[in-house]
Amino acid sequence: MQDIKTQEQETKLQKNRVPVDKIEKKTIVEKKPSMKKVQKEASTGDVQKEATIKKERRACTHLKRLVKVAAFLLIFALTFSKLSEVLAFKNASYEANNYYSFDYLYDLPKNSLDVVYVGTSQYHMGITPLEIWKEYGITGGSFNVAQCRAWMAYYMIQEVLKYQNPKVIVLDAAVPRGGDNNILASRRAINQFRCSLTKFQALYNCLELEGSTIDEMINKSFEFFAYHDSWDTLEMADFTDDISSLEYQKGYLLTTKCMPYSDMAHSIDQKPTRFMLDEKTVDYMGRIKALCDEKGVDLIIAKLPSDMWNITYSGMVGRWAKENEVEFLDLTQKQFQRQMHFDNETCYFDENHLNHVGAEIASNYLGNYLTEHYQFESHSQEIEDTWKIDYEAYEAYRDFRILQSTQDLSEFIELANNPNYIICLSIRDDATKGLADSECESLQSLGLNMRFVDRFRTSLAAVIDGGSVVVQKDGNFALSCEYEPYANCEIQVTSAGYSAGNKSSIVINGKEYSKNKRGLNIVVYDKTKDEVISSRIFDTWLMQDER
């Protein structure tokens, strides 16, 4: 009975048992996703991919816009700067005021200056850093503003010391003496500062902006806004003059005009107009001294020769210097001028400024003084090479300027006798009666046959190329010669003494360059530039003291 029951239970279990192969199939077979789900997932992936592409496109668009904005701002800044320079006030009566440059500071290698000179137009025209470097190896830069006052000098020094670590700062004595605040000149200099807190402080304090409205501040602070109404007064020179072309001279402006000391009105020039340092000047001079002490820089105050300086000014500045333990060099004193071999008759541009002759003498004295009192470190070869290149450019510019202005025939010949130059000579009327022996020697140094000197009112047509005479014709008749040194350069020289036609002509490439006046007409042609660089007349019919 029990066996029958057990058998029934097993039969029942077998009916409920699932075959093994079916269990395995059910376990192994995965459920395939529906078509809707596949389409949905594919659609989601496409959306994400499209969103990524759109995001990248937007980023690229934003980047392009950013580049365009940056380019626009850069172009605007450059245009604004150039227009500001074009519109800036130009001094028609005193050209030197138009060529102050401050921003050459940012092109100098950092900490490459041994000495920094800061001052007025007197330093601008009276100190030539490249001559000091050539003679003494001292690197220096001159940073100047017309009628520079102590507050302007303070901010210039502050800006310079961000980029240079000089051993000495030489400050113009006219700065502490004080005077009227030249806002036009100060603005022009400050606008060359790099954008910084110093620049805005300088604008505010040097341009007297306290109490001004925002519009007034903008109009006073920037050349463009200050002179935006002056379009109708612009001349070609406003667009063509480029002060940056002289930046290699390190803040120096070479001038060749000469005012003899005997022509000056000394009693008027030397009359004092100030008798004590004003409160604002004392304040900023104190700041200058404190800044120099903080940076470990020695401060020297120096006055260059000037007929507009007097014992009152010297006493004012000297007392401040003594109280603040600052060295004061007054080169207006006769004892210093004797040491310098300073010639009052040849060294002045006007009553208050030196010409190139005086500048070289004063610079030599300063260089010697600095060498005797300071030990300067040697410079890297890179800096030495750079200064050598700048000096050579300065020397060429110097010779060119003197060649155009000198009244000394011997000096002119010395400068014109250059391998790169062609010298053309033509006599009209007579050029021999007043010739000095030294002038004859100079002409002979060119290789000329001097037989013409013994002939009164003789004709002379000659061409010297690179120091060699290529053609010379002289006699009592009208004479002419031609010379073609190379293709597209044709020279014709004609000379007729007083009795032979009384004429001078020097034609180069079809253009007349002779002054056609009595005496020795000379034209100098620069082969490297393919242009005439000087056309002069020396009336050597007159004696030297009569010219």
Enumerate the predicted regions with their spans.
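N-terminal targeting leaders characterized by basic, low-complexity, disordered sequences
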Residues: 1-44
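Membrane-embedded segments
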Residues: 118, 122-203
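N-terminal Sec-pathway targeting helices
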Residues: 55-74
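C-terminal regions of proteins
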Residues: 315-385
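Short acidic-hydrophobic catalytic motif
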Residues: 399-422, 426-547
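Secreted/periplasmic serine-hydrolase-like ester/acetyl group-modifying domain
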Residues: 186-295, 378-398
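Acidic-and-aromatic substrate-binding clefts and catalytic sites of carbohydrate-active enzymes
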Residues: 147-151, 276-279, 305-313, 432
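Membrane/wall-proximal cationic-aromatic binding patches
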Residues: 77-141, 149-156
